[in-house]
């Protein structure tokens, strides 16, 4: 898909031209003409990129003779990338570290891994005295498998400045650098996902001062280590919060967690070679598991449709039974893909359904469990239910669920790497994300949208429980960081309202919204959560004008940690168009299956 929002010129226009001026232009220039201009720019950029890729391919035919290599475009720059089926950011990080350390071991060069400030790149320390041997070893590795190098100073290196390390000239540029980064670009089979310098490995040259090796730059742990100190092994989760905790880790394909890597002489899988200072667990390190819970409904299931029809004569508000609310656009499939890509630290995933299972779901995956409403509802007479407020009120009853967990709606996706601390601090405190949208004042009534009515009820309960404290704001549509203990307290403290919500088959004016609002305000008042501001978030109602343009920007920029694709306005006649629009976008953003899909490993 050619994205008219992707070219750099379009991005520069938005950054340079003030919002007011852009509005004036929009008022006086036909939208169709503006779209034609952007499409023309996109076509020219695509042609330029193609020419550059062909030029590189012709210049390096031998390097590209293998089927698992291809030329990709990163910004304006063509790069030789290694095709890794279903590669993830954590995979790219691990692979670059493995490539560097294997080259060093093969050359007999001592090294140790360093904990750096980055969660995506790695860092390896070598002795300054070994500089010539290090450069020779890595230069040879980059000739065999084409890689790139760049000196590292302040700030994150830019992909367009990376130097092709399969030539001789670039090594002269980095030969005297205290730190340089070595990267082998990775891409998936489609070429749409490219993992570049952000996931590379920094080589730090530590010099000797007396009995110590001293770092050329600061790091979060130790700037000097004893020269004669023995190396040790440490879990990779000590070096990046992207990695799962040791007890939550499952083997990669063909990997034995109990076996050493005898052939290469390296550390066991999941471990890295380091020094004792870097193997120590820090005070700020997370030690508790985090699970994910989804609620899902198959709105096309004939049995479910018949059941819903039996109870849906008089929904109190048109949004309460809006067809778009129950329509499955396969958002769950893509949300799980986003979780696999950008939150590999999650332990288990629970999918709560009305005895429904997507036919594409890999229910044999060890991290995934489908949970029936029947397993969690305290009162069986409340079923069947078609009320998300009711279902959400029962999530803490899931057997085996961790104390700290994230609640995802299936229309919520991760758009880039997220970390546990975006949701929970290492001491267990949760973070919630306030929306600028306000809860209306007044008593709930039949004219209120369901979210407004529930917000009003939440407001009353918080004021009564915590001495007149008034809540004003709604929450953003992000993964909700929840505590089971808080949900249990809400069920006890607000027993009547909780029971009434659980028993309401459709959203009603008497509902409370437990997971998406009430929990956060209750947890705040009891010292277990606080307002967060770390997530870059985008919300889009796909039924509104301009949705295609906004989706194009999301795809081009990939800067949002979280985005939500909601639909509160589409009529049934508009759903087919919205379906096509969303599917096209999501296939581009998440182009390959996750392990949670059947046949993903075929």
Swiss-Prot record:
Broadest EC class assigned to this enzyme: transferase
Region span, Disordered: 251-271
Keywords in alphabetical order: Exopolysaccharide synthesis, Transferase
GO biological process, one term: polysaccharide biosynthetic process
UniProt superkingdom: Bacteria
EC number: 2.7.-.-
Key word Transmembrane helix present: no
Any one Pfam family match given in the protein's UniProt record, by short name: Stealth_CR4
The keyword DNA repair is assigned to this record: no
Gene Ontology MF terms in the entry: transferase activity, transferring phosphorus-containing groups
Family: Belongs to the stealth family.
Miscellaneous comment in the UniProt entry for this protein: Stealth proteins are part of a protein family that is conserved from bacteria to higher eukaryotes. Family members were first identified in microbes as proteins that help pathogens to elude the host innate immune system. Microbial stealth proteins are involved in the biosynthesis of exopolysaccharides. Stealth proteins are predicted to function as hexose-1-phosphoryltransferases.
PANTHER family, sorted: N-ACETYLGLUCOSAMINE-1-PHOSPHOTRANSFERASE SUBUNITS ALPHA_BETA, PTHR24045
Protein's name according to its UniProt entry: Exopolysaccharide phosphotransferase SCO2594
Organism whose genome encodes this protein: Streptomyces coelicolor (strain ATCC BAA-471 / A3(2) / M145)
